[in-house]
Amino acid sequence: MWGFAGGRLFGIFSAPVLVAVVCCAQSVNDPGNMSFVKETVDKLLKGYDIRLRPDFGGPPVCVGMNIDIASIDMVSEVNMDYTLTMYFQQYWRDKRLAYSGIPLNLTLDNRVADQLWVPDTYFLNDKKSFVHGVTVKNRMIRLHPDGTVLYGLRITTTAACMMDLRRYPLDEQNCTLEIESYGYTTDDIEFYWRGGDKAVTGVERIELPQFSIVEHRLVSRNVVFATGAYPRLSLSFRLKRNIGYFILQTYMPSILITILSWVSFWINYDASAARVALGITTVLTMTTINTHLRETLPKIPYVKAIDMYLMGCFVFVFLALLEYAFVNYIFFGRGPQRQKKLAEKTAKAKNDRSKSEINRVDAHGNILLAPMDVHNEMNEVAGSVGDTRNSAISFDNSGIQYRKQSMPKEGHGRYMGDRSIPHKKTHLRRRSSQLKIKIPDLTDVNAIDRWSRIVFPFTFSLFNLVYWLYYVN
């Protein structure tokens, strides 16, 4: 009886002790126990040699990488580069950092990264990079129970991007980000995209003012240098330039200025001030557009697509100015000179012919001009005018007589009158030639302007058709 009661009494008093012991044991292994976590971290870092890679002397460390792109801030044609902000994450396994008793991942302070081995990753085509430091340095260390380490950084990098601008601004560019190990060869480290094609995210969120991202590709390969073979990962973007900005800022103004230069074809040929001022203004405007465009592009040795177009527009504008110079030369220069030579040649021929007509004198000493002679001379004068406003010249077919003044019919006086007959007739013909020289031929001038109104627009339209078909396709 007493034995049974004593056992019950022992059980009653020993139960709280067992519960306390179990609770104490659980509290030691509780992840929320800061002292236990501290002891675990201290144990991991105690004796850890940062100078040696994981599995030193064994197989290479496999480092997986993920990139979450925050933004592409700028693509510069002048500097041949682009600026990228991203969350860069690296995964690898370090058995020295495996732990037990805590079934949770340990996210540690960013300063712990200075006490652990991390891959010597760098960006091959980097020009300038930095890790953000507001409010603290933007890097993260996370440990998994099996020893897997996550090392994350928020980085902004300006990477080189060699561009082919031959088709600018109707071009597509391919910009890459090259990731490589600086010191470890493939015997010590291997890189791979963690997650395959989904290793890079955030591309669909990117919006650029002048480009659209057509696609992105991931490449993994090894490159060989004199010091060995090194792992390399490549992220490439195919960027297609948006043409809308250039249509409004470059192409449309150039087209309108070229069309404006053709207005001179409808301005009267004798309005020299208006036509010259219009031609010079359009030429200078095209020069200004071309100069402004070149300031935004690098000094490259080859011709770009937009250079071809602006040069074509400049040629059309310059030819429109030269067209008036040619018209002006025809009207005031070559035309009178040509007609002067023609008149002198005609006058000489008629002078020779007049010598054979000295004897065409009637009984009273009058010079007889046949109606056909008068008709021919008046037609030459009227033909030289070429304008209906200046060609209203009429004549009488009944014949014209040039009567000499009454002279004494002595022998000496008659001899002097006969000798003056050819001189007076030559003077009449010379006056006709001078009239032809003073009035230039307007037919050629008007024809040049009329043809220019057709040829210039047609040729410019053909130029645009060939240009856009070639560069767009």
From Swiss-Prot:
The chain crosses the membrane at residues 247-267, 272-292, 305-328, 448-470. Histamine binds at Y122, S181, Y182, T227. Glycans are attached at N33, N105, N174. Residues 1-25 form the signal peptide. It is a multi-pass membrane protein. Potentiated by pentobarbital, loreclezole and alphaxalone. Potentiated by histamine. Allosterically inhibited by pregnenolone sulfate. Inhibited by zinc and furosemide. Beta-3-containing GABAAR are potentiated by lanthanum when associated with alpha-1 subunit and inhibited by lanthanum when associated with alpha-5 subunit. One of its GO terms (biological process) is reproductive behavior. One of its GO terms (molecular function) is chloride channel activity. SUPFAM superfamilies: Neurotransmitter-gated ion-channel transmembrane pore, Nicotinic receptor ligand binding domain-like. One of its GO terms (cellular component) is postsynaptic membrane. Pfam families: Neur_chan_LBD (PF02931), Neur_chan_memb (PF02932). Keywords: Cell membrane, Chloride, Chloride channel, Cytoplasmic vesicle, Disulfide bond, Glycoprotein, Ion channel, Ion transport, Ligand-gated ion channel, Membrane, Postsynaptic cell membrane, Receptor, Signal, Synapse, Transmembrane, Transmembrane helix, Transport. It catalyses: chloride(in) = chloride(out). It is found in: Postsynaptic cell membrane; Cell membrane; Cytoplasmic vesicle membrane. Disulfide bonds join C161-C175. InterPro entries: GABAA/Glycine_rcpt, GABAAb_rcpt, Neur_chan_lig-bd, Neur_chan_lig-bd_sf, Neur_channel, Neuro-gated_channel_TM_sf, Neuro_actylchol_rec, Neurotrans-gated_channel_TM. The keyword Ribonucleoprotein does not apply. PROSITE patterns: NEUROTR_ION_CHANNEL. Heteropentamer, formed by a combination of alpha (GABRA1-6), beta (GABRB1-3), gamma (GABRG1-3), delta (GABRD), epsilon (GABRE), rho (GABRR1-3), pi (GABRP) and theta (GABRQ) chains, each subunit exhibiting distinct physiological and pharmacological properties. Can form functional homopentamers (in vitro). Interacts with UBQLN1. May interact with KIF21B. Identified in a complex of 720 kDa composed of LHFPL4, NLGN2, GABRA1, GABRB2, GABRG2 and GABRB3. Interacts with LHFPL4. Interacts with GIT1; this interaction is required for synaptic GABRB3 surface stability and inhibitory synapse strength. Belongs to the ligand-gated ion channel (TC 1.A.9) family. Gamma-aminobutyric acid receptor (TC 1.A.9.5) subfamily. GABRB3 sub-subfamily. GABAARs subunits share a common topological structure: a peptide sequence made up of a long extracellular N-terminal, four transmembrane domains, intracellular or cytoplasmic domain located between the third and the fourth transmembrane domains. Beta subunit of the heteropentameric ligand-gated chloride channel gated by gamma-aminobutyric acid (GABA), a major inhibitory neurotransmitter in the brain. GABA-gated chloride channels, also named GABA(A) receptors (GABAAR), consist of five subunits arranged around a central pore and contain GABA active binding site(s) located at the alpha and beta subunit interface(s). GABAARs containing beta-3/GABRB3 subunit are found at both synaptic and extrasynaptic sites. This is Gamma-aminobutyric acid receptor subunit beta-3.
